Amino acid sequence: LRWAGMKAGIGIIRKNNFFYTEKGSYQYLEAFLIDEPLQYIVENQIRPCAEKCNLCMRSCPTESLEAPYMMCRNTCVSCLTTWDGWDLRTEPLQNKFEKWIYGCDACQDAWPHNRKAWKDTEEFPELEAWSSHFTDTEIVLAEYSWLRSVVQPKLWYIPQGKEWRYKTNALNAMLNNYDPKYLPVIKKYVRMNIVRFVIWRSGCLKRLKGKVSVNRKMGSDVAYRT
C-alpha cells in the first residue's frame, strides 16, 4: 500500500521505508477497489529527504536501517517484538531493545516534522483509562485472561495464543532499564513459577550482573539486589 499511495500522489516513502504524508508518518493506509477512474486534483507539497540526512538510520537501536531505503526485518525491534515470533532466550539483540515493549517508533520519532505530529487536541477517556494499566510492571503481573481479552484485540500484531510475548517484552524492557522498584515485581513473578520466561540462561544472568543476582533456593529462583 505504501507504493500505491506514493504512485497515487498522496505521500512519499522516506529513507526509513515509512510512508509520509504532509502530516507525517503516523498514518494508516487502506485500499478500496472501485470500477471508476479517478482524477487526482490535489498536489502534495511534501519535500523529499535531504540527500545527506541520516537521522532515522542513526536513531535505529539495532542498526536495522542498513542504508537509505534498506531495512533488515531480522533485526528491526518493531518486528522482533511483534509478529516475527522471536524467542527472547536466543535473541542476541535483546539488550538493544531499550524501553520498547510493543513495536518501535525510534526512526519515525527522529524525523523532525513528526515531532509535531502528537497533539493533545482530543480526549479519549476509554483509552486513557486502559493505558493507565498498560505499564511494564502491570503487564508482567497481569492475568493472561486480561492480556487475551483486553490487550491483544488492540495490540494485535502479537497474535492470539502468544500473549506471553507482552510479558517477555516488558521484562526485557525492565532489564534494559533496571530500577530498584522492579525488584519486587521480578520476585513476585518468580514466585508465580513462570521464571522460564525471565531468567532462563546465562546470557540473561550476565545482563543482571551488578543489578540483580539470582540465587536458586529450594528449587525456585529468588532474585535479590546486590
Outline where the language-model segments fall.
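Amphipathic alpha-helical repeat scaffolds
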Residues: 99, 168-172, 187
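Short Fe-S-cluster ligation motifs
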Residues: 84-102, 136-158
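Catalytic cores of enzyme domains
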Residues: 1-132
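Amphipathic alpha-helical scaffolding segments comprising HEAT/armadillo-like alpha-solenoid repeats
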Residues: 147-153, 179-190, 211-219, 224
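Short inter-helical turns and helix N-cap capping residues of alpha-solenoid HEAT/ARM repeat scaffolds
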Residues: 163, 193-195
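Structural detector for internal amphipathic alpha-helices that build alpha-solenoid repeat scaffolds
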Residues: 167-177, 199-208
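Alpha-solenoid helical repeat architecture
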Residues: 158-160, 190-191
